UniProtKB/Swiss-Prot annotation:
Keyword Signal on entry: no
Membrane topology term: Multi-pass membrane protein
N-acetylglycine carried by residues: 2
Subcellular location: Endoplasmic reticulum membrane
CC per GO annotation: endoplasmic reticulum membrane
Protein's UniProt name: Inactive squalene synthase 2
Family in the record: Belongs to the phytoene/squalene synthase family.
Species assigned in the record: Arabidopsis thaliana
Amino acid sequence: MGSLSTILRHPDELYPLLKLKLAITKAQKQIPLEPHLAFCYSILHKVSKSFSLVIQQLGTELRNAVCVFYLILRALDTVEDDTSVPVEIKVPILIAFHRHIYDGDWHFSCGTKEYKLLMDQFHHVSAAFLKLEKGYQEAIEDITKRMGAGMAKFICKEVETIDDYDEYCHYAAGLVGLGLSKIFIASELEILTPDWKQISNSTGLFLQKTNIIKDYLEDINERPKSRMFWPREIWGKYVDKLEDFKNEEKATKAVQCLNEMVTNALNHVEDCLKSLASLRDPAIFQSCAIPQIVAIGTLALCYNNVQVFRGVVRLRRGLIAKVIDRTKTMDDVYGAFYDFSCMLQTKVDNNDPNAMKTLNRLETIKKFCKENGGLHKRKSYVNDETQSKAIFVVMFVLLLAIVVVYLKANQCK
């Protein structure tokens, strides 16, 4: 649930953590009895506990469609990510993946751990897919076809320019945003806005760029071959080879490049907020809003942080629990983006080559949040110091009281 020392430093996160633990337990008990769907929800919980949780509030039909959609794209991503699979085998599979989802006998063994289980037992996902309504099937097939073709293209092509970077992120995640929008429309719970394609694509790019940034070390250490998604147009300003950022003597250059990558990702924030504001169904809204808030929080944590090149950088579980607990309305979203933008702003070094660009971007985001949200109506996600101290005092007093009662009881004996 979280280490005791972390909870003591952030006692305001204890209650959300307990609620999250109960919600996860409840979700695990709600796995459908039907074998194919039972496998889908069970493996979804293994590959992404957070996504498994945030879709629980969706209606059954829509939840099943989103679950199957996620697993199909996760399987596609597993094929792409497995660098041990020869290119001549991998590319045809990616291109034909949209046809494999209709084949109940198809599977391809690759990946590791839970991802290998997903691939080995893919017939369960295919069977669940074939039971979805036609509108869901068509949306999922279309996105799978386009994503597979895009991934195949970048198996044989390096990410050289920022345009390449945006194109790759479109194939890897922008299409996920478009696909979810199509699924929501098919459910008749949402309607299209005139700019739905652009803003849906941006939500995917924002999430994908965040993952590419935080996963630098994991991707560069991939064997037998590194995965490299940072665009040469950015990293080439700082080093000769992308893997050089692992070297301690390149720490300053590494952090400067990291900061430019974060600043690039921030370009998508306004579209993300517009996309969330367009959603009408509360459950759909919450399932889409939580990952976006976690992304801006992750960027704030990664910015100017050399640890990205040394190990794992991720938000505290307690902070994620707080985000899940507090995200109910657009005011909450605007507040979260405002708070994390302020947090990121305090980390900007004026000597950084992109400092001015970063600060301007953050001011624009904060202004957008102020103009569109009631920031005074919500609790802060990152600045609850007074409340935290009060909770800490209460916890300390309660703990002391328990110890005193225990000691007195022993004395009586």
